Amino acid sequence: MALTVLAATALTALIMGKNNGTLMDHDKVKPFAQPIPTNSFEEAAVKYKPELFVSYGCHPYPAVQANGSVSAGLEGSGPDDGECKGSRLGSQVYSRSDWYNDKWAIMYTWYLPKGRSGKLQDRHFWETAVIWIDDPTLEDSKLLGVSLNYEDRRVSKIAIKGRHLNASKVLKFESYEAEKSPKPRLRFTEKAGKTQDLITWDQLPAKARKGLSTTKFYSSPFGSVKREMPLKDEVFLKRLKDAWPFSNKHDE
């Protein structure tokens, strides 16, 4: 019996994720207030921050707090949005930006405590979008393209349409139930959504970045699927390459 309990405990720890800090209940992680931008790169990230309408599954939650403690996520059991309809402490969206092939890429990512329920359950899920603009230092910067990067190296490339922008020219995304695979996906929508407090990768305290970088967000019951934080150093540029929506380096 003791060995059975130890094995179950070890398996649970593997699924929940490991890091050098502390794992916390998903609804107790304290989000960061959105900092006041101090440069044009941060201003652009705030300017283009999308709205998110959730029609399926979990709402976004903070993944890490200031001391580096990270969300333990949720088991993929019960209703698809069970215990994850929004944190009373507030939500969060994360971003990281850089030049890529002569265009400025702003990657936004939302953390969901679970991705899907049932036999193929996912604990931890990241939904990611990349917005491409011409130059963040320009007051009249132009939106050039959008990629909905689904975390498993698949990319959706859809032309930007007016109905997918709000009155302030902010993009509107929907987190919906994907066909053939009951898990959250991002798509463009005409529905009004909500925005979350944004914090960029560079604005995060060092302990928080370390927590997100070292935690292994294992999602499957046997720890075989790892949901990596898309903004961390060894993943970010690979994701930009996956998300590149233009036919060559100089397409506008």
Curated annotation (Swiss-Prot):
A motif (Hepta-peptide GHRHDWE motif) lies at residues 121-127. Residues 1-17 form the signal peptide. One of its GO terms (cellular component) is extracellular region. Keywords: Glycoprotein, Secreted, Signal, Virulence. Its main location: secreted. Glycans are attached at residues 20, 67, 166. Secreted effector that contributes strongly to virulence during infection by P.capsici. Key residues/motif important for the effector activities are degenerated in most NLPs, including the nlp24 peptide consisting of the conserved region I (11-aa immunogenic part) and conserved region II (the heptapeptide GHRHDWE motif) that is important for phytotoxic activity. This is NLP effector protein Pc118356. It comes from Phytophthora capsici.
